[in-house]
Each structure stands twice: as C-alpha cells, then as structure tokens.
Amino acid sequence: MLILGTPGSGKSFAAKREITNVFIVTKDDIIICDPEGEYFSLVRAFNGQVIRISPTSHDYINPMDININYADDDDPLSLKSDFILSLCELVVGGKNGLEPVEKTIIDRCVRLVYQDYLADPVPEKMPILEDLYNLLRKQEEAESQRLATALEIYVNGSLKVFNHRTNVELNNRLVCFDIKDLGKQLKKLGMLIVQDQVWNRVTVNRSAHKSTRYYIDEFHLLLKEEQTAAYSVEIWKRFRKWGGIPTGITQNVKDLLASREIENIFENSDFILMLNQASGDRQILAKQLNISTHQLSYVTNSGEGEGLIFYGNTIIPFKDRFDNTLMLYALMSSKPEDVEKREKLGIKGRDDS
C-alpha cells in the first residue's frame, strides 16, 4: 500500500485512520517507523509500545540481529549481507556508493562475524557492530581500513547508539519506533535498521501464521542511495510473500520512479491512496496508473482527506469527513489546535513522556 500527498494533505491522518481500523478489526501485528514523532499519542492510547531511539536514549536495537528464519533459502547470511551492505553504503559510500572491492570485503566479514552465533545461537553470541568493525580492521586490503575508519564513529564515537545488543522486548502487538531525535545524520540509518528489525518480526510471525503490518513514514528517504533502495525494494517484495503488509507514506512521488527497480514498488502495491498532489507528481501518477484528466481534478488543489483510491484497476474519488469532536480525531490529528485539545483532555503527548 502507498499513501501519497503533499504536506498538509492528510497523509499522517490517513495512515493513523488505517492503523486504528487494522488494530480494531484484525489481530495483525502493527509496526510503525515514525521519523517525526507523530504517532505517540495514538499508540499509547491503544496501550502500544513506543521505542524512542536517539543518541541519548537507553533503548537499543542491534543492526546485527538475525534469526535462522531470516531468509527463505538455506543461506540467511545472503540477505543479511545485503542489509549490511546497505548500512555501510549510508555510512561509507560517496556519490557512487561502495566499490566492488569494498562490497567483497564486507560480505566476507559478514560471513565470518556470524560463525560463532550460527554454531550456537544464544543471545550472548549475537554480534554487534563493533565485532564487524574489528574484523574489518584485521583484513589485509587497504579498502578494509577505509571501511573500518568510516565505521569508527558509529562504534566508539558520538554516533554509537547502534553499537549495542537489542535491549527492548518487541512482544507488543502495536510497536512504534520513534526516531525523530536521531537527527539528519542518523535518520536514514535508523529507518534502515528499523526495517531490518521488522523483517525479523515478519519471519517470526510467518511461522505463527500471523500477518505483520508495517507503516513507513517518509518512505522516500530509503530510496535515495542505490544499494539501500535495492535492498528496500527486495524487502518490500519479501514482506508481501511472507505475510507482511507494508505501507509507504511519502510526498515524493518522483523518488518512487527513480529507477526501474524502485518502480517495482508501484507494481507490487495493490492499493494506492492519493491525496492532493503537486503538478509534476500528478502527471507522473496519471501516466503510471492511467488516470484520466477528469479523475486528476480530485487530486488538484483538493482539501484535506480528499483524493483518489487506486485498487487493482479501479480508480474512485473519495472524501473522508471524520467527526472532529471525537477524542479519536484529537488522537490522530497533528494540527496544533488538536494537540492542545489532547492536552486539555489529559492525554499525554510525546514530550510529556
């Protein structure tokens, strides 16, 4: 599923409305990646779990986490290696991403770093980023030293929030990863690591015949770098195959068509909710989804909660008029006046926790 719209068109409200409906009428697990801290009140109202990841928090998620069901073939390390390559691309890669030699070195070290854990999969043997860093330092190639140096700030420096074993229990049915306080330098990395944590949850739930819903706000941030985008597209496909239901929320339609590979996300989305669109994005969507000129009028200067729904080969206009006197409306709205209303009702906000 995709939720597309300009700022202020009601994307987050639409996502929260969908999350609320799923929470009430299904038994699916729901996980949210929240880059702007917008989902706190709703999640807490449903007794969900908010995990705040920041350089100063004490909640940790380990990017090296893996389980034996991580992939659907005999080699879970292949997919994990793709993830770590994506992570290293964000940390190390310049304009052209990682060099082939660097990819080879990383892949080699990934296979080495998990040897002890896969031989005896107990929690205390799960590697952390520092173990990968130490292995890189031991390699003979000059490129490995460059990789290790780039990782150093994430292991021993001021950005070491991801150099810990996971210390939060993710057993709640509704989980929100609040990464607002990671800052610009760590946010994309945080989104990628959360996505990997969700994949681990999907693999566990598959065995229990349970669906996993994943909502990714500011989804376009994962599509900027080539390796990261390729990994995200692959995970998107695997989510659907393994009983996961991903929802990307973004204002940047152009990023969804940045390459033929990324375009597969469109082709693998049965349901697209389009709110008000910028002029250039309207033309892209019209071509991609075969939307008529008349239908485009519903996403041209449209009001909040108005637009088009694309489902299968059907396109229908909609207007969502939600009763703004309800407490649920106050929980879902991010308008300042509604935040104030929540406070008057005694509902804790993100900064009150």
Give residue spans per PLM region.
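Short coil/turn connectors at secondary-structure junctions
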Residues: 26-28, 210, 269-270
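C-terminal regions of RecA-like/P-loop NTPase motor modules
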Residues: 6-8, 253-353
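Glycine-rich phosphate-binding loop of nucleotide-binding enzymes
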Residues: 1-55
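P-loop NTPase motor domains
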Residues: 37-49, 55-57, 62-244, 257-260, ...
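Short, charged, low-complexity patches
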Residues: 7-16, 77, 81, 187-191, ...
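H-loop/switch region of ABC-family ATPase nucleotide-binding domains
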Residues: 250
